[in-house]
Amino acid sequence: MAVDTEKDSVQAGSPMETPGSPVDETTEPVVTSKTWIVSMILSCGYGLSFWPIPVVSAIGTMISADMGDPTGYIWTLCKETNPIIGMDYLDHLCFLDLVCFIGHIVVASAKSTNQVIAGLVVSGFGGANCQMAAFALPELLPNKWRHIGVVIADLTVYIAVIIAPVTARYGYELGTWAWNFWGVAIFQGLSFFGLLFLYHPPKHPLGIPYKEAFKSLDYLGAFLFIGGAVPFLMGIVWAGVYDSNDVHVVAPLVVGAAVLVCFALWESFGKLKYPLTPTYVFASSWGRDFTAPVIALGVVNMFYYSSSILWPQMITVFYTNGGADWKYSVILSLPQGFAIFFGAMLLTCFGSKLRHWHWQLTGSVFVMVVFGSLLGIVTPTNKGTMIAFIFLSQAGFGWALYLSIAITQMGVEHKNLGVSGGISGCIRFAAGAVATSIYQTVYSNSLAKYTAIYVPSAAISAGLPESKVTDLMAVVSQGAAAMKSYSPAVVAAAEAALSQAYCKAIFVVAMVSMAFGILGLAACLCCKDVDSKMTNKPTIIRRD
């Protein structure tokens, strides 16, 4: 992709004059001011589309409760839907900013959880496709800056991760939470106009006219993919609400999985002119070019969600008196966002110096997995240690995430960059949805299990009659205020036992996340080094 009016402004003979000209690797590449402006607009469009995620994560449960639907928040966390349909052929990103703009307005004006969910679905559709900025932006720059381009694409996301939880909580407490969406809608609209006037995608490398592209799209494949992915993800969400053997869980999971198998068979044996997921992309170099790094990308994203679930729970349960000290809770939420930014900056500054990209990916994933798994040794008193572990784990995540995206881009030919982006985005967000459901289900089940083990025996030892254990269990998770009818000794014993149950539940989730992390490490070891592709040459095709 490129800014089509920029060609005349590039210095004659510069390394970026034409994509096919020989490139002097000893000369630093020239990138014009318009390219940087468009790069920043692309970054803003993506980051602004991501803003609702940390906002909803911070205050979604409270908003749902205030609107009279305490369980509605479950669906607000499942908004990112990344279609791969035609992303290799239809790639003008300004339209997606407009979609996000509409979604933000719907949420900001919401009077019910259903309207919030509807708005998040709209903005999620646009936002999941806005993540194509991670592919559109780096190809404007020389290949050796590919990892830096991915970091720049997420630059506004860092701001969202760090600031949005703060503005969300303050906005909720002050009754102005909707401005988290009104404000973002304004800037998303400005991003739309910026891309509309300054960014013009080049001709597709396959030379396919838009009319032919629409005719040649794999509509049956798209139908099968959507028809399988939607019920499958619904089943995963229901697993956090119903028992695992309930029809609400089993039926959509089975139907969704069966349809996805049909989708895979259709893509593999359908003899399609332009398949959504070309098999040769996955099979290249026995999967080492693209399949291994995209698996690593999905697992890295899965590991992020374990920390995003465990750390807020630890803050609420152990460090802020059940969330009563919400200002201190906001402060404790900052290390995670700053750590991701720090890891991304380390990649930007040292990636090209260290080279050996596949070993960088392996090392950063190793750091993420080790320190993320060590969150499982939490106690109510080791706050400093946990802050250090969450920072180190998320710094590893920041390095690994953007490097894995860059390596997936390098694993395909330029003509398949849209396919790579669509598949990578689908796997990234689907893995996140699966991980979120697994972690939440494991956490809630483990907490219930260990609460039933530790609390009754502790309370009885403190003098509680066995006949009152059932009544105590009904209110123990609501805090000391709900246990006023019990003696101080019983309350203290019950709270200590409940803290122990929380520690055990967190440990189990940390071990589950470690299992995923080991899978990610195996995928990293299978990746190929892309150093030979890190050249001064940009992967762009300009309009003539």
From Swiss-Prot:
Its main location: membrane. The chain crosses the membrane at residues 36-56, 90-110, 116-136, 148-168, 178-198, 221-241, 249-269, 290-310, 330-350, 361-381, 387-407, 418-438, 505-525. Gene3D superfamilies: MFS general substrate transporter like domains (1.20.1250.20). One of its GO terms (cellular component) is plasma membrane. It is found in: Cell membrane. It is a multi-pass membrane protein. Keywords: Cell membrane, Membrane, Transmembrane, Transmembrane helix, Transport. GO terms for molecular function: transmembrane transporter activity. InterPro entries: MFS_Str1/Tri12-like, MFS_trans_sf. Belongs to the major facilitator superfamily. MFS-type transporter; part of the gene cluster that mediates the biosynthesis of PR-toxin, a bicyclic sesquiterpene belonging to the eremophilane class and acting as a mycotoxin. PANTHER family: MAJOR FACILITATOR SUPERFAMILY (PTHR23501), PEP5 (PTHR23501:SF195). This is MFS-type transporter prx5. It comes from Penicillium rubens (strain ATCC 28089 / DSM 1075 / NRRL 1951 / Wisconsin 54-1255) (Penicillium chrysogenum). The gene is prx5.
